[in-house]
Amino acid sequence: MVTADGVILDHTGFMMRLIEAYAPGAQKSLVLGMAAGMIPRYLQRRGQQVAAVEINPNSLQAATEFFDFDPKGIEVYLEDARTFVRRHHRAYDLVVTDLFQGDCTPDYLLTVEFFREVQACLRPGGVVIINTYFDPANEIANDTIVATVSAVFPHVLELRSPSSAGLVSSACLVAADTPLSPEVAIAMADKDAMPSKDFHTLKAARLVDKQRLKNTRPVSDDHNIFSILFASSQLRYRSQFNQLPPNLLVN
């Protein structure tokens, strides 16, 4: 959703702020899951060389017809994200993952092996920004996602809304092989006007405490239990959407 003065109110606008904060000098970026195409266009406007990977051709069609997405100057690949990253090593300064299919991320795109493949795509000093969701009623599942990413990247920053009113809500992780500072996100909160949720989420940025996760097992391809861990959360998430007006388009 975009206001009349151009402020983006959903998770897309929040991810743009994270890009500005943690990858200001990126020259070549990869977007896995293009949704409405707003992130690839934003990166292109920043002067970057951009590749966008989307498995669903209907998403590309919808982005073009309804969200004014123009693929000119953007490398668009209709392909599975996982097969794409396997072929591109040391190629990108920034990788953005927004890999939702329906109301969840496919579980094979949440494993240690997948994040290792994403890590291999990065140039030295590169950053990954991961869009996901957290359920305040299911901290085991939340911690498992964080532990899985942390098993690959030595530095992980967690950004989740401190006041989600008990609802399943979007969250982001920033991951890198080089140190990250939550102070960068905190400073971004004071930079310009933004939705209240984004402000408080940036202010609550924290580095992942790996000691806290020492008893949480990362998920692998061979033992992928995310569909089980998130079953109750997905039901809660769907029930939230059932309360929306039927004519509202949710991206």
Task: Go through the PLM ranges and name each one.
Residues 103-110:
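Glycine/threonine-rich flexible loop motifs
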Residues 60-89, 94-97, 103:
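S-adenosyl-L-methionine
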Residues 1-53, 57-67, 145, 242-251:
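Class I S-adenosylmethionine
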Residues 1-6, 11, 17-21, 157-251:
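Soluble small-group transferase modules, centered on the S-adenosyl donor enzyme superfamily
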